[in-house]
Amino acid sequence: MLPTRRPLAEVTRELVAVATGKLPADTVIKGGKVVNVFTGEILPWDIAIKNGRIASVGDVSAAVGPETEVIDASGYYLCPGFMDGHVHVESSMVTVTQFARAVLPGGTTAIFMDPHEIANVLGMDGVKLMVDEGRELPLKVFATMPSCVPAAPGFEDAGASFGPEEVAAAMQWPGICGLGEMMNFPGVLAGDPAVHGELRATLAAGKPITGHFAMPADFQGLAGYTAAGISSCHESTRTEDALNRLRLGMYAMMREGSAWHDIKATIKSLTETRVDSRRAMLVSDDTHPETLLSTGHLNHVVRRAIEEGLNPIRAIQAVTINTAECFGVAQDLGAIAPGRYADILFLKDLARVAIDKVMVDGRVVAAGGRLLVDLPAVAYPDRVRHSVHLKEPLTPWHFRINAPAGKSRVQVRVMEIIEANVNTRHLTVTVPVVDGQVTAGVEADLAKVAVVERHGGNGSIGLGFVRGFGFKAGAVASTVAHDSHNLLIVGMNDADMALAGNTLAGCGGGMVAVRDGQVLALLPLPIAGLMSDRPVEEVAARLAAVHRAWQELGCRLVSPFMTMALLSLPVLPELRLTNRGLVDTLQFKMVDLITG
């Protein structure tokens, strides 16, 4: 049974009594070397804990009573628990509970999640589901209210639509700590009334607005974006991007996840300059299940920053006090200091981020990489498990692309993927016509793409072509398709594309690979078609099987799943496909597939 977490206002008298020697502590940690994130010092402090919070530090011998648990921390560095300031839990493909099970042993004790993936499928109900689930966990789960649902109104159909009214309502919910990443930076700069209505509702609630400004060359645009009250941004990919954010007073979130490896460049904003690092944050953004198992979570991100030359204490500040101050929770979190929750990591080696024990609310919850506490079981309602609503079963006919009469060859627009890069190239390619149909082709490395509306709406299907996956046969499909998470199918023949799509509709969503009418591998993700409630180890194993099946079909990409999932996100350059058709994202307009 996990202890009840009590607000500071309810325990002030007890904390003061322990600090002044009038009341014994519940727990005392002795002999450790405390990382002081306020001053950057390492101090030989003992720590007294009462009611899950730190009552005092330094010489706390007066707080030791006959019932006090004394923990010997000799040989350990002690630092605050790590806090992820920007994470999409859904990207891990597991629920909040299973995510907590995976990351707590590695030292992550708090997250600030942006649940905009589930919001696009289940709306406010989905956001509330994840927030409520997080309240029952030792991991401290905060959420920012998704701001861009859908990501590109008018170009796609999602399962919900948010505006100022929804944002204002969510700001009153417990656990909502701010506004999620404002991807509609053109709307911010153009003065879009709905966008600024969301900003106004958040600022009126006294909560921060997190950013997503993806125009690195536009400093004046970034300045205008910041003037709207947006206080952080994780879209730095170059040294100068991070520096510009720091210089404008933003929190520069530097990310290292499964698909984004930005720290090598962005950390130079700190290591090659003399700028103050207290507005720098280290975040994960998107981390897949196999990454959580193989390299870890924030422990890996901090380690990478140190490997690139950042002082270990500055790296720790970037996942503790800096994060807490960004979100206005520094009175409770982010430091080993009186009044704060006793979320404490025991490290054998600071530079290697060698975490041996993890304490949350004054209780050791993990040791030696293993979780020591049971997490509550969660029952998900049927509406969450059955979120794939196709207008009708798919047939090969749905994927036919008719050529203009009399044509033997046509020119078509093609999305060309760039490995390890979120962008696509907008190409025009000449392709053959067979029996009146525009066809995919192995020789040209062209696969057909379909985005099928799956939220019970109009059932529309957008069709296009993609180059770069290397498929020789078969088809793959996924309901993880940013950000509206419609049913995304890529294939070399229409029959296999239909089978792939229908397979996912039958299991509530997930990822699948098929060939010649047979399912090669399937990862069910029944929670909104995005997540599994199975342990991360099981999900990672099934995901690996899907990856092997992709390789059997000819794909040689290192990280193909995120590459595919972004094909349908119409806010990224240069060409994307939604259920409504092709979007030229540089001109922000719908375009025809066949050009001549």
UniProtKB/Swiss-Prot annotation:
Gene Ontology BP annotations: adenine catabolic process
Reactions listed under catalytic activity: adenine + H2O + H(+) = hypoxanthine + NH4(+)
InterPro entries, A to Z: Adenine_deam, Adenine_deam_C, Amidohydro-rel, Metal-dep_hydrolase_composite, Metal_Hydrolase
Keywords: Hydrolase, Manganese
A Pfam cross-reference name: Amidohydro_1
Gene3D superfamilies referenced in this protein's UniProt entry, alphabetically: Metal-dependent hydrolases (3.20.20.140), Urease, subunit C, domain 1 (2.30.40.10)
Cofactor: Mn(2+)
Keyword Manganese: yes
Keyword Hydrolase in annotation: yes
Enzyme Commission number(s): 3.5.4.2
Molecular function in Gene Ontology: adenine deaminase activity
Family label: Belongs to the metallo-dependent hydrolases superfamily. Adenine deaminase family.
Protein name: Adenine deaminase
Organism of this sequence: Moorella thermoacetica (strain ATCC 39073 / JCM 9320)
